[in-house]
């Protein structure tokens, strides 16, 4: 029996750990979650921490910011030109850190404004500004739609991550419309655009979970018309991406 257990332990240790996305999403497979509403609610620190573990997103943001910096500042302007980069909805600062890394990698000078309405996240930003960022970053405690910087602080690059899970569920256009006023003519918005895709699939597990969600104050079918955030694992897709 001892050898049998040792063999099972050996097999378990040989199980592939999965790619970074699989590791990040472990424990959330086929689990119904309500979409977040960060404009209406102030997110908790634990929620930000989950976001910041995304293994792909911030790396891609860093690449995009670096490309924008190199496009706006030519080699002969390295010592003369300093760009203003504004992060709207800065959270606890992952995009600020990505911007500073991109600045260092591209050798382009930037001044960063981190605009955040959540007072809890602002405290974290201010602490990082005090301990690490110094004069490179200015923390602004304000709703991006209400902030009115002086014209000399208008953005050459405007960065946001209000992408949401699907469509406009985090009110990205509504928020960014108010922030467009401090983007310079010819400035760059990251992301420039994004697209949501929809396709049919079948999942017996999720169907039964939704069916078991009962609320006496709602119509019996209301839960079937409610949006959920799900990391799919056991399902059958009827239309594959081309």
Give a label for each model feature.
Residues 67:
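Pre-Walker A adenine-sensing motif
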Residues 99:
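Aromatic pocket-lining residues of Rossmann-like dinucleotide-binding sites
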Residues 1-57, 63, 72-83, 88, ...:
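Class I SAM-binding transferase module
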Residues 92:
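Conserved SAM/SAH-binding loop
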């Amino acid at each position: 029996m001892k050898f049998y257990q040792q063999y099972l332990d050996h097999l378990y240790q040989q199980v592939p750990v999965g790619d970074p996305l699989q590791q990040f999403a472990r424990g959330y497979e086929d689990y119904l979650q309500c979409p977040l509403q960060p404009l209406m609610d102030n997110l908790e620190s634990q929620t930000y921490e989950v976001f910041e573990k995304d293994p792909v997103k911030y790396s891609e943001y860093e690449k995009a910011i670096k490309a924008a910096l190199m496009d706006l500042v030519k080699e002969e302007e390295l010592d003369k030109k300093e760009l203003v980069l504004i992060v709207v909805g800065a959270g606890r600062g992952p995009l600020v850190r990505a911007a500073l890394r991109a600045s260092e990698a591209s050798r382009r000078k930037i001044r960063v404004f981190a605009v955040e309405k959540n007072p809890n996240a602002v405290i974290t930003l201010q602490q990082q500004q005090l301990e690490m960022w110094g004069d490179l970053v200015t923390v602004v405690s304000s709703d991006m739609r209400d902030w009115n910087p002086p014209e000399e602080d208008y953005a050459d690059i405007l960065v946001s991550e209000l992408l949401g899970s699907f469509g406009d569920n985090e009110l990205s256009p509504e928020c960014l419309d108010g922030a467009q006023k401090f983007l310079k003519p010819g400035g760059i918005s990251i992301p420039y655009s994004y697209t949501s895709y929809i396709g049919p699939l079948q999942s017996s597990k999720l169907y039964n979970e939704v069916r078991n969600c009962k609320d006496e104050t709602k119509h019996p079918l209301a839960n079937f018309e409610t949006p959920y955030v799900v990391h799919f694992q056991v399902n059958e897709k009827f239309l594959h991406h081309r």
